[in-house]
């Protein structure tokens, strides 16, 4: 296995480029600080404003805790109070003190009392990063989140996460989602590192094998998103709601990039810990990246990555979402680190050129979260600018090794 192979003229080894990434990350952090509300963090509009009545939500809060933990570990001022604020919200109003787990909003004020794997994966990720940052209360939160993942969501017989439950943990949803298992894989990689337990890497491998090596390989290496409880694909799922923000119809090229990066992290982590490393991890990562580029990039007459494709790999929802470019650039960086092959340098520079030209909002701050097919700001799928996590990680990942969690890697660099 080639470890962190970088050409001498690569942007990955360029000090000015690394400084540019750092500066871009700082700008993103400064914008996101306005999202603080009494019970956690809320979503911001495209101007960086939040309404006085804007509610906190658990996914945003968990992602902010994770992101500000990464910043605090680097020694960036002003982040520790934000981490502690988010941890207090996750330990308090966002938590179900009766049945355990977390609501989507404080005290389930939005009426949604279901417990979702996607959300709980982010709570565990936030707690793990806050623990590395040494914040009070993070260890207790991490223990509780891990217990919920193990006792409620992890299905040993499936080698994957169950999707959701009713508030009292009855009514297990018959749907299985690649998206929640993808973020579960991300979280399990962090847990293996922070808890020093190989078990989480074995579970991550089982999820990746099911979703990617078994199913995506049969779909041109574009991840199939939706399955029934027996892991049979649901090709018509949300055909009448193709632009859903979490469960869109068809295939999602952006998730191909994201999975490609995660497979490389998994490969490196398993090698570092002396665990068996399947050859398909690298092979599938290459294929995922190639397919996402072939079918997602510049396929409708303009630059950018379309949100979704149909089963013939034709664009369905042509909006360009910011997280897809963040993940594309990070995947290119990971493959460049892993292989040293020049084509990944070309893609890495191409994606960041696009981000700089189209995504970065130099008038109001942060990144446009959505552009239409003419690369003009749009709010069809995602209103406002609620997300720090994807873009901020994109500024960090190219500067860090593949093998350990972001939080631990940043701590080692200090």
Protein language model features and the residues they cover:
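Glycan-recognition and catalytic cores of secretory/periplasmic carbohydrate-active enzymes
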Residues: 1-414
């Amino acid at each position: 296995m080639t470890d962190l192979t970088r050409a001498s003229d690569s942007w990955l080894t360029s000090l000015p480029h690394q400084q540019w990434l750092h500066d871009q990350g700082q700008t993103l952090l400064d914008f996101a600080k306005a999202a603080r509300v009494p019970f956690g963090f809320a979503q911001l509009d495209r101007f960086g404003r939040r309404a006085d009545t804007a509610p906190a939500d658990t996914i945003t809060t968990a992602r902010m805790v994770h992101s500000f933990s990464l910043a605090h570990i680097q020694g960036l001022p002003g982040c520790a109070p934000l981490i502690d604020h988010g941890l207090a919200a996750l330990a308090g109003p966002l938590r179900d003190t009766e049945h355990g787990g977390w609501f989507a909003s404080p005290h389930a004020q939005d009426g949604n009392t279901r417990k979702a794997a996607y959300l709980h994966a982010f709570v565990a990720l936030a707690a793990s990063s806050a623990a590395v940052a040494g914040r009070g209360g993070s260890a207790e939160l991490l223990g509780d989140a891990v217990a919920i993942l193990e006792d409620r969501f992890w299905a040993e017989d499936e080698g994957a996460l169950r999707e959701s439950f009713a508030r009292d943990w009855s009514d297990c949803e018959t749907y299985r989602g690649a998206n929640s298992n993808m973020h579960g894989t991300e979280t399990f990689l962090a847990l293996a590192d922070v808890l020093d337990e190989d078990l989480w890497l074995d579970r991550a491998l089982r999820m990746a094998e099911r979703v990617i090596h078994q199913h995506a390989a049969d779909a041109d290496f574009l991840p199939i998103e939706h399955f029934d409880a027996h892991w049979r694909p649901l090709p018509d799922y949300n055909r009448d709601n193709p632009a859903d923000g979490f469960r869109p119809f068809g295939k999602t090229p952006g998730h191909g990039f994201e999975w490609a990066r995660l497979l490389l992290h998994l490969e490196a982590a398993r090698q570092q810990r002396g665990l068996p490393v399947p050859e398909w991890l690298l092979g599938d990562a290459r294929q995922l990246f190639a397919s996402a580029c072939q079918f997602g990039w510049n396929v409708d007459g303009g630059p950018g990555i379309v949100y979704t494709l149909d089963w013939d790999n034709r664009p369905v929802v042509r909006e360009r979402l910011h997280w897809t470019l963040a993940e594309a650039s990070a995947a290119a960086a990971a493959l460049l680190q892993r292989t040293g092959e020049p084509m990944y340098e070309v893609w890495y520079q191409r994606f960041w050129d696009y981000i700089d030209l189209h995504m970065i909002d130099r008038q109001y701050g942060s990144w446009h979260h959505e552009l239409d097919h003419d690369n003009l700001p749009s709010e069809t799928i995602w209103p406002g600018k609620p997300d720090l996590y994807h873009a901020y990680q994109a500024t960090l990942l190219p500067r860090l090794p593949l093998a350990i969690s972001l939080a631990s890697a940043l701590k080692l660099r200090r």
